[in-house]
Structure formats: C-alpha cells, structure tokens
C-alpha cells in the first residue's frame, strides 16, 4: 500500500476534533469515506492512531508520535518546491528579497547601495509586504532573504535554528503625534494616566512592529485610558493618519525622522515609551545559489566591520 499525503490532513482533523463526523465535514467528505482513509493510514503504519473506545476519540501513544513526525513531514514537503527552484537556479544571478513596507522605503535602498561596493549584484526582485507574509515567503523558499525589524526579547515567526540572521542596522519605535499651534503634541501618552482618553493608532496582528510593541509595551498601554481610533498593518498608513492629527502612533524613526526634524510630527511621550529595534536579514540555513551566498558573505563582512571598524 502506498501512503497518500492527504491522509495527514485527515489525521490532523480527527486529532483536533476527536469526532469522526465533525472531522469528515471539515475534510468535505462522508463519514464512511473519512473513516476508511483513517483506517488505511493505520494499516499503512501498522498501528492504531486513535482509541475509538473513548468519546471523543483519543490519540494513542503512536498517534502522538505520528503527530510530531507528520508535522515535520508537511513542513519538509512544503519547502520542496522552493528548494527545487533553488537547485534549478543555482547559476542565476537574481537575488530575491522580501522586506516589510517600512524598510523597503527607508533602509533597503541605501543599504543595498553600500553593499554593492562589496559584492557584485545582478537583478533584484523585491516583494514588499507585512512581516507575517514575508516570513511565509522565506519559509516557502520563494525568496532568498527577508529584511525586517526585530527585538531580542520578542520571537519572530521563524525558527532561529532553521533561519539564521544578521543584525544589519538599527531603528527605534517612537510615539509621535501631530503638533498643536504651540508645537506641543496634540495627543500625549502621559495624558492617559490623568483620566483623559488618549487616541491611539494601532498595528494589526499581521504587523511585525505590532508584534514587538504589544509584547514590550502592551501591558503598560492597557493601563492607560485609551481608545484606538484606527488600526492598520502598515506603518506608512499610520504615519499619514498621525500627520492628519487623528491620534498617537508608534512609528519607526527611519520612517518619520524627516517629519520630526521639520516639526510635522513631535515626540508624544517620554523616552521610556520608545523601543529600540534591530534590523535583521534572515535566510534559510540550506545552501542557496552562488549569487545569494556571495551576497550573504558580503552582508556578514559589512556587519562585522560595522561592529569592529
């Protein structure tokens, strides 16, 4: 008997629900057909994966083992198309990047220009998206590299062992607001501690900056009298709304540095509310083509010289 990879999805559905009927509905098939597929998987393995005597159906010891192995197998299979492309394009000079929107506009262009003096670069393909989507592109080997904000205390969506990274720059999340006629912030964070409601502009769940901010400052923000007047996944959108005077937003200093210098935005809280950030370049640990490996080596050299000039 040959194993059908879709049986893993059947197993996962039943393991999650413990109910054959509900799992069959999730897999869009009749219960008898679903039960036959689970039985076929067990026959292929030579062991029972579920204790059918219990209600709901309970995963057996072998089933718990298979749950872990199956997850690893699915991750491995999902990565195969990207790895196949990597082998096929080993001699290609094209570099494929995924970068968050904020860094695509601010950090990436001058950083690439500086690296061009150290490495010969061919064409570059850039995908600009929210960090969650960028992580997915790297995990699926759709890109060679991902550039994103990071913080040492906040886990990214990528496993450190499988996705090594370099700190290639720094930034800072700064709470900012449009100024009033006297040059003072229209929306002050400390105002939320005195009973006044502070209007906030927030990041959505897909945002890497939002992930960092919620992890490090979320509890303190929740203690304030506040109201979110707008939520978005792009820092550039929050910047536009902040410039319009709608509320206070934590924005990357690389994005709003010119606004702060020209007085279009002002810092709206004390230094304790600011968050120092790393800018990290991520890659998959498996070997890429010569062009990508050459670029990684140049980035490593540049980073080492930046820390030890």
Residue ranges with predicted function:
Residues 92-155:
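Central regulatory/effector-binding core of bacterial HTH transcription factors
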Residues 129-198:
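Acidic, Gly/Pro-rich loop/turn segments at junctions of secondary structure
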Residues 107, 183, 266-309:
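A late-sequence structural motif
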Residues 157-166, 171, 236-285:
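Beta-alpha-beta core module
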Residues 182-186, 190-191, 196-221, 306:
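Secondary-structure junction motif
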Residues 130-131, 139-142, 149, 208-209, ...:
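Hydrophobic hinge/microswitch elements
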Residues 12-30:
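Short helix-boundary/capping micro-motifs
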Residues 42-61:
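A short LG(V/I)-centered, amphipathic sequence patch enriched
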């Amino acid at each position: 008997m040959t194993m059908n990879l879709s049986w893993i999805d059947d197993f996962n559905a039943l393991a999650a629900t413990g109910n054959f009927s509900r799992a069959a509905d999730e897999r869009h098939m009749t219960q008898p057909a679903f039960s036959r597929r689970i039985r076929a998987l067990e026959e292929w393995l030579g062991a029972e994966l579920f204790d059918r005597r219990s209600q709901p159906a309970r995963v057996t010891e072998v089933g718990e083992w298979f749950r872990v192995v199956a997850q690893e197998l699915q991750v491995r299979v999902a990565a195969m198309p990207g790895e196949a492309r990597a082998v096929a394009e080993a001699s290609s000079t094209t570099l494929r990047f995924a970068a968050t929107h904020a860094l695509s506009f601010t950090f990436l262009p001058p950083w690439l220009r500086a690296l061009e003096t150290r490495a010969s670069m061919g064409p570059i393909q850039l995908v600009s998206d929210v960090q969650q989507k960028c992580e997915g592109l790297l995990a699926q080997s759709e890109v060679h590299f991902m550039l994103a904000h990071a913080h040492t205390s906040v886990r990214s969506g990528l496993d450190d062992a499988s996705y090594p990274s370099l700190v290639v720059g720094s930034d800072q999340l700064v709470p900012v607001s449009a100024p009033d006629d006297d040059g003072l912030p229209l929306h002050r964070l400390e105002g939320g501690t005195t009973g006044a409601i502070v209007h906030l502009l927030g990041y959505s769940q897909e945002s890497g900056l939002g992930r960092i901010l919620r992890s490090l400052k979320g509890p303190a923000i929740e203690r304030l009298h506040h109201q979110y007047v707008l939520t978005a996944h792009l820092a550039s959108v929050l910047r536009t709304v902040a410039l319009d005077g709608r509320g206070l937003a934590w924005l990357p200093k690389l994005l709003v540095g010119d606004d702060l210098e020209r007085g279009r935005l002002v810092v709206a809280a004390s230094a304790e509310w600011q968050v120092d950030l790393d800018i990290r370049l991520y890659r998959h640990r498996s070997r890429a083509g010569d062009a990508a490996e050459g670029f990684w080596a140049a980035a490593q050299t540049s980073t080492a010289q930046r820390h030890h000039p």
